[in-house]
Amino acid sequence: MNNSLENTISFEEYIRVKARSVPQHRMKEFLDSLASKGPEALQEFQQTATTTMVYQQGGNCIYTDSTEVAGSLLELACPVTTSVQPQTQPEQQIQVQQPQQVQVQVQVQQSPQQVSAQQLSPQLTVHQPAEQPIHVQVQIQGQAAQPAAPSIQTPSLQSPSPSQLQAAQIQVQHMQAAQQIQAPEIPEEHIPHQQIQAQLVAGQSLAGGQQIQIQTVGALSPPPSQQGSPREGERRVGTASVLQPVKKRKVDMPITVSYAISGQPVATVLAIPQGQQQSYVSLRPDLLTVDSAHLYSATGTITSPTGETWTIPVYSAQPRGDPQQQSITHIAIPQEAYNAVHVSGSPTALAAVKLEDDKEKMVGTTSVVKNSHEEVVQTLANSLFPAQFMNGNIHIPVAVQAVAGTYQNTAQTVHIWDPQQQPQQQTPQEQTPPPPQQQQQQQLQVTCSAQTVQVAEVEPQSQPQPSPELLLPNSLKPEEGLEVWKNWAQTKNAELEKDAQNRLAPIGRRQLLRFQEDLISSAVAELNYGLCLMTREARNGEGEPYDPDVLYYIFLCIQKYLFENGRVDDIFSDLYYVRFTEWLHEVLKDVQPRVTPLGYVLPSHVTEEMLWECKQLGAHSPSTLLTTLMFFNTKYFLLKTVDQHMKLAFSKVLRQTKKNPSNPKDKSTSIRYLKALGIHQTGQKVTDDMYAEQTENPENPLRCPIKLYDFYLFKCPQSVKGRNDTFYLTPEPVVAPNSPIWYSVQPISREQMGQMLTRILVIREIQEAIAVASASTMH
């Protein structure tokens, strides 16, 4: 016999090989089927078997598979796939859910039409499952007022579902100011004759002969709610999702229909192949993204008593593209005046001022209403402006909002009324401050060109200095980070074009470097280089460089914007952004709390809550968890220098559990660290006041220092948990969320620890904790 048994394996070995390819979440089902059905179970799992591949990219190992990763502790395995919310008026979105398949008729031609990357935009996106990618060109013939419904035919889109395919009709109507359309789930009794209406901006009617082009493009990731759906013919809605280059998976190429309508946002219809309902990542370098427009329609300026000038965004409901609806407001604050506002504006009929003090946050609004004009004066400063103090009071910048029209007067001035500058002289008794029970009314005048309205503001005289936090942001605003990036990219591109004109043309076809204004579509290398340059070149509206804490706040806003729009790049810890973290460290390393000439300490723009918002604190990744532990050790153990953190070790951090005397079942756990370990004498009795302590946070376990410390120990190698020379271990470059080991046995370098600590010392709560500890030590 010529048949050889060299390449054969036993049945038991074949079962082991097959078991390795079964996904983790189906392993129990595979074993049960193997026990009950025997060899037939191997045939059932023939199609579901997947292969895990490992390949090299730079210095990292990239794991590629199509299985779902089980969730880990503290929601660590949750993927960052968030839907893109429309930011501006022209952006539209249609969400359609349909219980059964929709029959789509398409006329297929031999010559496929190509669509350029600039024509594709997922601002109007509908996902529809398809069996295979095809190239189709469809012609729509319609009237100017109401287009005819397109009729499409193709056998390749029909699914062999036992139920009959239902017909759907799409009608496009025109409507003004249509920003977002969401079609709820249609009852089954209305399925045979359902209608889906898509609203477009008025003034753009479909002319006869406009083309609808279809082209295969990279797959976009559907939202997590679409995973594992049993409906095969359900039409789905997805958004552009660009994931981190470390985590890539192979997907099929779907169909994209691009509706090219002149003057309107380009609509993209994406079809995901049937059976692929997991969160996929496109391998294509050219990404379909959402075009983000400018959010500020006009810009005003404000001048402080010291001569500094800042830019105030003036929010408006008018479209940004109309130059007639934009206005510029200049607000000048005299040095000798404060505590009253005098605004000169267009004729109005009514003015109202309301000042409230709620939860240490004062909100002042002035609403001026007319039939065709509305004016709003906001005394809350822009989040990028530092607090300014004069004579024990705060100068509050005033932002003027044009809602229904433009201002008639081009110049507006803010006059501030000082009760101490009245012509009549006060007696020495009157100049003494009254007791806290007595309050003095301060007059606030809002004067328009037609009439004046006076409103009394009650403010305690015994509190001449309101909280400086009134002028500082309480949370991150991603649109501010995007706006700063856009302004810098426009300025930088203009400089590059100007330099290119003065130089000789480069040899070959090398294109000039241009920074994209859309952060989502920016490549990793381009974004890293752009952020590096921003640390030195970013300027505010007046051309002045940002303060270091404000610049750090802007980068945190950019980080949150990336996460909210489907990018999982961590610009503060990923290896791709090492250059950026080094440049940012050079900016922040010499930051000290700012003190005014009167002795007031200006708090930092960056707060602890902001870092939780943009996932810089928590257990989302090994680097984030390490940063969180360093943050808690700095805040509670008061470790302010790199040397102090280097002395921290696993053996020096003690875990303690206390029982409640009244309730033995009630236990509280804490971790303790001996303060100033080197100053205590040998043999000296250690008391409780010598320890710095971190306590539990039962209200929010995801932010509990004890649980995060336990999770850190759980992810560290067993051999290092008793070491007395290190505490911060080096994170592994690429790990799975449910991997048992996240860190190597090597401690992090001194340079890396210094960069992490520099960013932590800028946080407002850290500065306050250090200031309180220093004050208590002096006393």
Curated annotation (Swiss-Prot):
GO molecular function: DNA binding
Residues carrying N-acetylmethionine: M1
InterPro entries from the UniProt entry: DUF3504, ZnF_MYMT-QRICH1
Any single GO BP term: response to endoplasmic reticulum stress
Subcellular location: Nucleus; Cytoplasm; Cell membrane
Region Disordered, residue ranges: 141-163, 219-242, 420-443
Name of one Pfam family that matches: DUF3504
Compositionally biased tracts (Low complexity): 420-430
Positions of post-translational Phosphoserine modification: S346, S467
CDD domains recorded: CARD
Keyword entries, A-Z: Acetylation, Cell membrane, Cytoplasm, Isopeptide bond, Membrane, Nucleus, Phosphoprotein, Transcription, Transcription regulation, Ubl conjugation, Unfolded protein response
Record carries keyword Transcription: yes
Domain notes: The CARD domain may be involved in the regulation of caspase activity in the context of programmed cell death.
Record's function text: Transcriptional regulator that acts as a mediator of the integrated stress response (ISR) through transcriptional control of protein homeostasis under conditions of ER stress. Controls the outcome of the unfolded protein response (UPR), an ER-stress response pathway that either promotes recovery of ER homeostasis and cell survival, or triggers the terminal UPR which elicits programmed cell death when ER stress is prolonged and unresolved.
This protein's name: Transcriptional regulator QRICH1
Encoding gene, per UniProt annotation: QRICH1
